[in-house]
Amino acid sequence: MKACFFRRYGGPEVLEYGEMPDPQPGSGEVVVRIHAASVNAADWKMRAGQYGAAVSFPHIPGRDFSGVVTKGGADFSEGDEVFGVCEVPREGAYAQKIAIREPIVARKPKDLTHAQCAAIALAGLTAVVSLEDTLKLERGETILVHGGAGGVAGFAIALARHLGAQVITTASASNHDYVRKLGAHRAIDYQSTDFTKVVNNVDAVLDTVGGDVTMRSFQVLRPGGRLATIAAGPTAPEASRSDVRSLRPNVRRDRPHLERVAALVTQRAVPLPAIVEYPLAEAAEAHRVSEGRHLRGKLVLRVL
């Protein structure tokens, strides 16, 4: 099969496009012919050796996908359209085929394209787990979402609005219209404004940026507030205050959460993100764009 893979850690240039062996399914697995795979920060962090989970070389990256079952199992039959999120550090979705456990695969909604399903799988899953399971965001609360134009943050903005929260987000000025359309009540230009000077006493923060943004965000929480970060490594950072909580979402890859993501989109509670597509053979260029961290929405690789 054709795939994009890397034989060593490094920059985007280490990604190769070529032939790899077809996957051999194990017990409880199905084989999926991938039509689309999305690009996530986790992909280039793994390629750069920054992810924490060791991989064997050559390694196929890619965490989420959408496609058609070619070898069925107990829950899915040949020809079923499905989408899902891969397990780390197993082989990923930058390939024409993947063998994957059935419990982490869900049926693709008929009114969504493969590119759209690939775009919402991991981003939506992360947002749902972060807001509903980890932060337990409630109606009437105020949340600050960092990096609002990104895939996870964009889904989180829309979900928070759907849950009845007041939503503040940070984004470049050029993306303010975009994040407002997603549901943000207020947008702050992080390039010209220090958010700690204009935000205070919020109930929750979702940090998708990391670095000093994480630690500075503790300043704007109310007493008893909570911060969830998906950008600070495998564990939550120690809070800079004793009266707030620091949390690290445990993003569970399972069918119920994938079905929740799909339902939010198909029921129009959450809009689809802006999508930029690249052919699978141009995954290296997609990684360069993703690493630039100025993307609006999601990058998707066309596999078929």
Question: Each PLM stretch: what is its role?
Answer:
Residues 197-204:
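A short acidic, Gly/Pro-enriched loop at the edge of an enzyme's catalytic core
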Residues 117-189:
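Mid-domain Rossmann-like dinucleotide-binding core that forms the NAD(H)/NADP(H) cofactor-binding site
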Residues 21-38, 48-89:
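Glycine-rich beta-strand-centered segment in the early N-terminal region that forms part
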Residues 269-273, 287-304:
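C-terminal capping/lid region of NAD(P)-dependent oxidoreductase domains
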Residues 89-102:
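A structural motif shared across PLP-dependent enzymes of the aminotransferase-like
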Residues 90, 208-271, 280, 303-304:
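Glycine-rich phosphate-binding loop and adjacent beta-alpha segment
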